[in-house]
């Protein structure tokens, strides 16, 4: 599907960028692809990736999604875009809301507009469960990003730039997530700081995140949102699982919820569940393709919103301690940390 094509990954030196590049290299997709453009702000991370991967198919572009010109210049000749650049730390976004808006909303606008201008065939935008019923700035900014993508998709046919969205749960061991924090605290002999023990989160691996984006890329139609069905765990069980894996007896200290945190997350709202298509491992949420001429819908009638629950980390499959340990031990990050323990 990428034969002789050019792919651009915004925020390409982050957790997702590293994961998708590893997949391409291990599966030999890299041999078929014409070029992969890594677009990001951090020259040090680009240099580290350049040295670590040392592949002539990788081209590096310094730039910021906030700057339309840099995005536009990097996108000349690009066939496909994975838009992963974002500010994603919930407390940070609470304190600096305009920074979140500038990157997650206006930056996305720049990426989508440049893709349309440069006649990119397909863009897959990476979103988050926090965009569903958002209560924090990060979730609000990602919800607006989704709305931007869908609004632009609504005005385009399948023969033009196709815009679709993937919505993630918690990606385990991604940069800035709780698993690296707990492991560092365990190895340093510190107390494990738990916000709220009964808080639940979806558990999704970096491998899952790549699978979701590639599935959306292959199957996505104009304005689609794709969600992967994922199990969940309480924060307390996750911490205990890591303690058991590392043979730790560190004390646990409860610190209370941080700025902007929710007790549980939702991946699909009850409103979207009414129109979601169950694809086995995934949900596909088609866009609402109606225009602003509402009069005809009053005459023709409107599909009733189904009385369904939203799909949340509280009502999905809940993993017990042994299941969480088994899942954690499949992660390369945890395996490497165990070797270095």
UniProtKB/Swiss-Prot annotation:
EC number: 5.1.3.2
GO molecular function: UDP-glucose 4-epimerase activity
Catalysed transformations (reactions): UDP-alpha-D-glucose = UDP-alpha-D-galactose
Keyword Isomerase: yes
Keyword Manganese: no
GO biological process entries: lipopolysaccharide biosynthetic process
Coiled coil residues, start to end: none
Keywords of the record: Isomerase, Lipopolysaccharide biosynthesis
Pfam families for the chain: Polysacc_syn_2C, Polysacc_synt_2
InterPro entries: CapD_C, NAD(P)-bd_dom_sf, Polysac_CapD-like, Polysaccharide_Synthase-Rel
Signal peptide per UniProt: none
Xref: Gene3D superfamilies: NAD(P)-binding Rossmann-like Domain
Superkingdom as given in the UniProt entry: Bacteria
Protein role: Epimerizes UDP-galactose to UDP-glucose.
Homology family: Belongs to the polysaccharide synthase family.
Name of the featured protein: UDP-glucose 4-epimerase
